[in-house]
């Protein structure tokens, strides 16, 4: 099929990662919808190969990248090169909904690494909505 429609709501409920790429059959790049609860402290991480684009759909995102910390609202976005550590948190009192797109020359496999080993368990417990 040459196209596919979907919505975040169709990909699951609650907080966590929603696999847009799988649901829509995308193979050229990685893409997830991410829903963070109010006050969620993000996960500082980097990638071997994938750059990422974070797009804020709703809520507020506190983005720590390099030496900079910036708050983004709906419509805000940031591009982060693969090996640059980044952390996205939700400083607000409403859920944060983001679209995260990653890729490098068509590479879509998982290649992320947590900076703080304690975040490995926290990330695993955070939840993944299966699709």
Pin down the residues of each PLM region.
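Short acidic-glycine-tyrosine-enriched beta hairpin
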Residues: 67-83
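A short, N-terminal "cap"/entry segment at the start of jelly-roll beta-barrel domains
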Residues: 1-28, 43, 109-131
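Glycine- and acidic-residue-biased ligand/ion/polar-headgroup-sensing regions
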Residues: 49-51, 55-61
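Short histidine-centered beta-strand/loop micro-motifs
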Residues: 22, 42-48, 89-91
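Ligand-binding loop in jelly-roll beta-barrel domains
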Residues: 25, 62, 82-108
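Conserved short histidine dyad/triad with adjacent acidic residue
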Residues: 17, 32-47
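Short strand-coil-strand connectors
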Residues: 27, 64-68
């Amino acid at each position: 099929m040459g196209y596919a429609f979907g919505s975040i709501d169709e990909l699951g409920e609650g907080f966590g990662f929603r696999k847009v790429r799988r649901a829509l059959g995308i193979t050229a790049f990685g893409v997830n919808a991410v829903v963070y609860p109010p006050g969620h402290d993000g996960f500082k991480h980097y990638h071997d190969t994938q750059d990422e684009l974070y797009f804020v759909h709703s809520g507020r995102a506190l983005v720590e990248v390099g030496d900079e910390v910036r708050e983004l609202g709906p419509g805000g976005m940031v591009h982060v090169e693969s090996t640059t550590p980044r952390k996205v948190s939700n400083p607000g009192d409403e859920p944060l909904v983001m679209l995260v797109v990653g890729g490098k020359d068509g590479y879509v496999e998982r290649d992320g690494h947590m900076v703080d080993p304690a975040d490995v368990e926290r990330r695993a417990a955070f939840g993944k909505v299966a699709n």
